């Protein structure tokens, strides 16, 4: 019934298996991939014909994690998977980026790649396996995909590169880098690092590229026996029509791209396009030599060509800068004084308002992953409203791009955050992009660094980011620093580098062509370093290190540690005690399983009151010390006094006063505040207290009585 084909190799010390022909046979391509004991199913379906009037390639990549893969049942009311998690969105983008440029130019059929995690061994992350499976499914599907590709994760542990470190090894690694590409070229890099130098980062990229070559060979081996017939798709030859359009628009476009102001430049480009449309689509003429879709494709292509020619021929860019100059930068902090920390970062026509908010442990984000539930104490949210580019558009929940850009900035800042023991706050940074003309994600990095320092978060060092571009024609190439929005799409390599003066904390690269050598990437990274250091210098004009004190409106958190066997005493039955402490003092209290207690309030007196209360519960009373207490019960033989948190002790009738007492209630009443001295414990461990040795007015010990007690004891 099944015509199955299977390829197995050893990769990174674990077996990798690719199998097709048994599951999802009605898809154009389907591959079940297993690495260790983690298993994913990748499927590809592509429409037989493009939709009429389609002028772009509608590729969708959906990566989905099923909770059954880790032996779990989803939480929530419906008990089933819902909208994609942040991680699912990020992995979908991770797979999309290297495969998208490998579809043949002009292919516009609706194409969907779906990757489902079926089993997770809690050791091998399914993201790399999903990329491999998607590549294999595309390669055997018959769609015009110029792959295969593969991917690999590279760690850096004890000065050595590690291929596909397992989940338990990652905390030890100074690098989390994912690289993807073909057998010939690197196409995509995504990483987080702990201030690593450029040569180590580039070495990791090349190590990863070399390490995944056996996987590409395995995919080719599978395709040789299982691939479907390639679709009969011939890209449309528009070269003759392009030459005709170029003759009409070249001068106008060259003049338009000399205009440095974005909106004026766009208007000039639109005017050039309208003029060409009048030429090729005269009013009243039905038969034209090209369709509107063909003209749109050609015009877009020519825009890129002319800008590329100008840069390579003259070394001058759209806005008049040379290749390595960064746009003018203005940094401001404290622009919203009632927030905990704020910054306005402006670089040319790109601008971000970033606001930092500090919270307590209650504000941490609970993340329910396949590997288990954990808390995240640092959140960075990136918002890109349509007005930032002078347009109208959809507002609402963040899209894939916003989630991806936010995570890139998160990776850049995260390695520089203080340890939880040093700074026990939950941190949320929100970046509002108010203007955009290239590299808003890197503006977010710079703005977040400024806002955190303004908030008093003791980050290790300031972090800055820069977006770079690269254009290559034959042997000629140009590396562009701080690219504009118009330069973002026409380059052969776009990459974003963030870090401190000492090293890289995040690197993202997207390479669209073959021929980008290691040497070219080295030049590009060195130029990016110069730009990053320049930006850090400009940021330092506003603030160069974290403020010594938190903002006026930020909560204060103090940490104390209690014995783990006392946690239940502080919480109380059903949370009764801790609720009372919170209600009476006004402070927020968070207790960890290891006995760490975080007490938060914007009022220092509330924190002290809560600390004192908790201390009274967990501390042991000391013999010879004097305590203030409350009479909770009277009896013929004495009074019971609550004197040390929930602790009670007996003041025997003989210890109530210096004179003889006939009746307990002659001296004390229930609810009365008294001073007592802890005399010791009886043979049953019961507390013995005395009032007569303490001045009930001042709470001071009566010295004469003290000496008498010492004599009596002898």
Curated annotation (Swiss-Prot):
Keywords: Cytoplasm, Magnesium, Metal-binding, Nucleotidyltransferase, RNA-binding, Transferase. Its cofactor is Mg(2+). Its main location: cytoplasm. One of its GO terms (cellular component) is cytosol. Mg(2+) binds at residues 488, 494. Residues 624-692 form the S1 motif domain. It is found in: Cytoplasm. InterPro entries: ExoRNase_PH_dom1 (IPR001247), ExoRNase_PH_dom2 (IPR015847), ExoRNase_PH_dom2_sf (IPR036345), KH_dom (IPR004087), KH_dom_type_1 (IPR004088), KH_dom_type_1_sf (IPR036612), NA-bd_OB-fold (IPR012340), PNPase (IPR012162). GO terms for biological process: mRNA catabolic process; RNA processing. It catalyses: RNA(n+1) + phosphate = RNA(n) + a ribonucleoside 5'-diphosphate. Its EC number is 2.7.7.8. CDD domains: KH-I_PNPase, RNase_PH_PNPase_1, RNase_PH_PNPase_2, S1_PNPase. Belongs to the polyribonucleotide nucleotidyltransferase family. This is Polyribonucleotide nucleotidyltransferase. It comes from Brucella melitensis biotype 2 (strain ATCC 23457).
């Amino acid at each position: 019934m099944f015509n199955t084909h299977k390829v197995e190799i050893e990769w990174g010390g674990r077996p990798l298996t690719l199998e097709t022909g048994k599951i999802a046979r009605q898809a154009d391509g389907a591959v079940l991939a297993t690495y260790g004991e983690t298993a994913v199913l990748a499927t590809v379906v592509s429409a037989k014909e493009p939709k009429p009037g389609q002028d772009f390639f509608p590729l969708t990549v959906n990566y989905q994690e099923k909770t059954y893969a880790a032996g779990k049942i989803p939480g929530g009311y419906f008990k089933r998977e819902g909208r994609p998690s942040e991680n699912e969105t990020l992995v979908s983008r991770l797979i999309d980026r290297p495969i998208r440029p490998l579809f043949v130019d002009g292919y516009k059929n609706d194409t969907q790649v779906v990757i489902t995690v079926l089993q997770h061994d809690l050791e091998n992350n399914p993201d790399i396996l999903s990329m491999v499976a998607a590549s294999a499914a595309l390669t055997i599907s018959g769609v015009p995909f110029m792959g295969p590709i593969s991917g690999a994760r590279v760690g850096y542990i004890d000065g050595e590169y590690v291929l596909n470190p397992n989940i338990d090894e990652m905390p030890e690694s100074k690098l989390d880098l994912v690289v993807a590409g073909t057998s010939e070229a690197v196409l995509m890099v995504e990483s987080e690092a702990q201030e690593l130098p450029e040569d180590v980062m580039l070495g990791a990229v090349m190590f990863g590229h070399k390490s995944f070559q056996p996987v590409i060979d395995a995919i080719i081996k599978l395709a040789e026996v299982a691939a479907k017939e390639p679709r009969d798709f011939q890209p449309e030859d528009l070269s003759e029509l392009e030459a005709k359009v170029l003759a009409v628009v070249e001068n106008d476009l060259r003049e338009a791209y000399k205009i440095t102001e974005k909106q004026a430049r766009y208007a000039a480009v639109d005017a050039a396009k309208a003029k060409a449309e009048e030429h090729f689509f005269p009013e009243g003429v039905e038969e034209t030599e090209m369709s509107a879709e063909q003209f749109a494709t050609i015009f877009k292509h020519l825009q890129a060509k002319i800008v590329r020619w100008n840069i390579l021929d003259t070394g001058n860019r759209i806005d008049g800068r040379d290749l390595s100059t960064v746009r003018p930068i203005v940094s401001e902090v404290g622009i919203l004084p009632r927030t905990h920390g704020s910054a306005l970062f402006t670089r040319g026509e790109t601008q971000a308002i970033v606001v930092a908010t500090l919270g307590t442990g209650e504000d941490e984000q609970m993340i329910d992953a396949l590997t288990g539930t954990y808390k995240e104490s640092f959140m960075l949210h990136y918002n890109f409203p349509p007005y930032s580019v002078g347009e109208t558009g959809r507002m609402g929940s963040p899209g894939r791009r916003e989630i991806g850009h936010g995570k890139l900035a998160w990776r850049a800042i995260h390695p520089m955050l203080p340890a939880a023991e040093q700074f026990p706050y939950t941190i949320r940074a929100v970046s509002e992009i108010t203007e955009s003309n290239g590299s808003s994600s890197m503006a977010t990095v710079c703005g977040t660094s400024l806002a955190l320092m303004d908030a008093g978060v003791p980050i290790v060092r300031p972090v800055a980011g820069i977006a770079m571009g690269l254009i290559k024609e034959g042997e000629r190439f140009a590396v562009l620093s701080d690219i504009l929005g118009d330069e973002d799409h026409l380059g052969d390599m776009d990459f974003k580098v963030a870090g401190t003066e000492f090293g890289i904390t995040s690197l993202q690269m997207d390479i669209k062509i073959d021929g980008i050598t290691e040497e070219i990437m080295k030049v590009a990274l060195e130029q990016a370093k110069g730009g990053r250091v320049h930006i850090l210098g400009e940021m330092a004009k506003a603030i160069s290190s974290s403020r010594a004190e938190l903002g006026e409106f930020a909560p204060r958190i103090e940490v104390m540690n209690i014995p783990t066997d006392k946690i239940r005493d502080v919480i109380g039955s059903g949370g009764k005690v801790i609720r009372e402490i919170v209600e009476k003092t006004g402070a927020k209290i968070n207790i960890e399983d290891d006995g760490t207690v975080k007490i938060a309030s914007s009022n220092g007196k509330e924190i002290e009151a809560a600390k004192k209360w908790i201390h009274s519960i967990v501390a042991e009373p000391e013999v010879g010390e004097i305590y203030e207490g409350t009479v909770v019960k009277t009896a013929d033989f004495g009074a019971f006094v609550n004197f040390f948190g929930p602790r009670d002790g007996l003041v025997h009738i003989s210890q109530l006063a210096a004179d003889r007492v006939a009746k307990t209630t002659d001296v004390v009443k229930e609810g009365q505040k008294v001073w007592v001295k802890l005399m010791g414990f009886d043979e049953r461990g019961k507390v013995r207290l005395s009032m007569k040795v303490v001045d009930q007015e001042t709470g001071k010990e009566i010295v004469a009585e003290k000496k008498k007690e010492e004599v009596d004891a002898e």
